[in-house]
């Protein structure tokens, strides 16, 4: 369906296939504009896109790939042993990113401003994956933890918290809204 052979892919009723998470999200925001997940004003939209890019590129490379890729995917796919230097780097980088999330939410209600946006959803998706393997040091990043608790408590996010990977259960706090 996707010439690049990647997910996600959204297939519309007429058979049109859209690929790429940002493309799909912006398409859905255009088709279902209320409430907007990108933002209404150009600067707000730009800030949302900047943060989506931050998490999908920078956070993904510096944290998600180093922790989930090394600790989980290598084991799950029986590829090789985790590279401990990569895992250590992922843990160190995680603190930097949680500090940045804390910085943002100490100044704004949500990551990109006063409204929940795709930036919050993107960041929460990455963090949820890492939280599933128990590698988010929430206790030393209270503002980020409070922001994530608000995301976790949203009805639209809760189904994600009940997903489990066979033979790899999440830590007890994973689905707890008051972690």
Where are these regions (language model features)?
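A general structural signal marking secondary-structure boundaries and capping sites
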Residues: 32, 105-108, 155, 164
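Short secondary-structure boundary/hinge segments and terminal tails
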Residues: 28-29, 148, 168-170
């Amino acid at each position: 369906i996707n010439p690049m052979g990647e997910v996600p892919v959204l297939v519309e009723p007429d058979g049109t296939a859209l690929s790429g998470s940002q493309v799909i999200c912006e398409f859905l925001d255009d088709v279902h504009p209320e409430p907007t997940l990108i933002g209404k004003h150009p600067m707000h939209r730009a800030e949302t896109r900047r943060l989506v890019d931050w998490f999908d590129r920078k956070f993904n490379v510096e944290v998600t790939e180093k922790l989930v890729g090394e600790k989980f995917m290598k084991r799950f796919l029986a590829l090789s042993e985790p590279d401990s230097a990569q895992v250590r780097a992922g843990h160190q980088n995680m603190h930097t990113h949680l500090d940045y999330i804390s910085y943002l939410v100490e100044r704004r209600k949500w990551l990109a401003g006063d409204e929940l946006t795709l930036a919050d959803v993107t960041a929460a998706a990455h963090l949820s994956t890492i939280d599933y393997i128990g590698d988010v040091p929430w206790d030393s990043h209270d503002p980020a933890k409070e922001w994530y608790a608000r995301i976790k408590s949203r009805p639209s996010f809760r189904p994600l918290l009940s997903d489990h990977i066979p033979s790899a259960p999440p830590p007890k706090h994973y689905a707890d809204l008051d972690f």
